[in-house]
């Protein structure tokens, strides 16, 4: 697994994106001895955590020629996980008592996460690797069977250029291109429609009857945010489990999915109940989108499956020169970015070996076949979770838990790299948090104090960051 020291090599690597994935990818690559260039279209680090009041002119984000806004952060957004388990392994996301402008809450708002990422970039001198306000519009192999990659880019001033790299790591996120559910009659429904990507504040829905489609993180948050000002909020969700939800909001109602909508403004649910509504908010998730990537068919996106990819990271035919960080959802994102990046960096240096292309493809094909045999749609390929905690997989039997848990996934990567995997306390905090009551869980929690103390004992191993005293 580990080659002799003289076979370790340094690569010239491009990282696409300076969000939470791109920042830690750059750090891990440089730690492994690689030369790194990060391309970031915005003026600052942070990726999806960069909050802007701007929304797209097409509130459903259907128009392919629209001006794209690359943030989906709404004003009231707070983390849905406690800060201790959110951070990178060796850069604790703890409170900042030395700075009164910081959010000290255990479930802080989006601004605090943004400040944490800025602190991380400063501590590890990552900004010196970034080309800000530079959009990548083409990534492709330089030639057939080539081990080099051409990256073409354009600055905000309109100046274009290209560079050649040994490898490209894709960290562009997947919260920009919305998915929409198919609803019969929606084209002629007269009310206002908006995707959560373009939701910022609840004011436009004051006094209205609002339908919220979807009840994952954004649907849960946004429905409650709107309920403060709206006349009624009706949530349409796929799982029967949501029908059992209770809420402190008397105007918040749960329904099964929508059967059809009509020109008179009515919305009919699968159980036959009819509501006349003023607006529909689509909290229906996002599509994986890589408009800049040209691989001559080696990597495709089909029904939100990016593939073929070995362990959600490497396309067998193009490995290790092309890799993806952060595709799996329903997992501890920052920790996952970090351990995936460590694996990629180690493979690129030659310190860790991948299986052959044929062996990787066999693994991918077997995984896809298992998903198909269980009737799991392609769009759930990158769900990294225990099915018993995910209502959409509630009909699966325990032995059918083909979607491996995040701890199994992290442990497997850690074994490849010879590094530490997820800490016990971090996993337990995550498991507790995802089962919390939606109304109050951010301000009322019953975590075992020993788990929290264990986290802070781990944090004490790391020297206080220089940024804490600035």
Swiss-Prot record:
As recorded in UniProt, its EC number(s) are 1.8.-.-
Which residues bind NADP(+) per the record? 214-219
Annotated Gene Ontology MF terms?
flavin adenine dinucleotide binding; N,N-dimethylaniline monooxygenase activity; NADP binding
Q: Where on the tree of life does the source sit, at the highest rank?
A: Eukaryota
What keywords are annotated for this sequence in UniProt?
A: FAD, Flavoprotein, Monooxygenase, NADP, Oxidoreductase
A matching Pfam family: FMO-like
Q: Where does FAD bind?
A: 17-22
Matching SUPFAM superfamilies, A to Z? FAD/NAD(P)-binding domain (SSF51905)
Q: Which GO terms describe its biological process?
A: glucosinolate biosynthetic process; response to abscisic acid; response to jasmonic acid; response to salicylic acid
Family of the protein in this entry: Belongs to the FMO family.
Main role? Catalyzes the conversion of methylthioalkyl glucosinolates of any chain length into methylsulfinylalkyl glucosinolates.
Listed name of the protein: Flavin-containing monooxygenase FMO GS-OX-like 6
